[in-house]
């Protein structure tokens, strides 16, 4: 059985997937407006997990992080680093690859969302309200400098993914 927090965050995953699909519907061009909405939404989603969900889980778990938290944080770092770069077919493919591996870590039967909601002391109602009220993340313009590309590549590798997925950048 899934709880309120699980459903809220999983539904947000579906919304983000739809936005990314919309942004890439035309194989010849990326819909900049749809991608910008995806970018903003994914950064907000990551922020909700990093600033609300994972700290609440840690507090409910005797001030110890859940075992999956470290891997999720590495994935979040890789995704955020990729969102710094101007979207291209290469960066979008990398984002999709990471999300395809990442989302089951959160939504799966043993995923972090279920783990959180099963913790004694994890108040789903309070956490859900905080998630709903989470603010958008401020975004800067895209940066495609060699340092930004290297940072994205390093974040992807730290998270355990193949840096070759960024070949051509």
PLM region descriptions:
Residues 1-169:
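Small-residue-biased structural context
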């Amino acid at each position: 059985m899934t709880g309120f927090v699980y459903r809220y965050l999983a539904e947000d995953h579906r919304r983000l997937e739809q936005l990314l699909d919309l942004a890439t519907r035309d194989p010849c061009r990326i819909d900049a407006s749809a991608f910008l909405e995806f970018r903003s939404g994914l950064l907000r989603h990551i922020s909700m997990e990093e600033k609300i969900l994972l700290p609440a889980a840690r507090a409910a778990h005797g001030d110890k992080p859940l075992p999956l938290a470290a891997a999720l944080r590495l994935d979040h770092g890789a995704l955020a680093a990729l969102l710094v770069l101007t979207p291209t077919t290469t960066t979008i493919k990398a984002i999709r690859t990471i999300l395809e591996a990442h989302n089951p870590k959160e939504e799966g039967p043993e995923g972090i969302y279920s783990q959180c909601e099963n913790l004694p002391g994890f108040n789903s109602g309070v956490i859900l309200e905080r998630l709903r009220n989470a603010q958008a993340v401020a975004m800067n313009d895209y940066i495609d400098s060699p340092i930004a590309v290297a940072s994205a590549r390093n974040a992807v590798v730290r998270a355990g993914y193949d840096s070759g997925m960024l070949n051509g950048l």
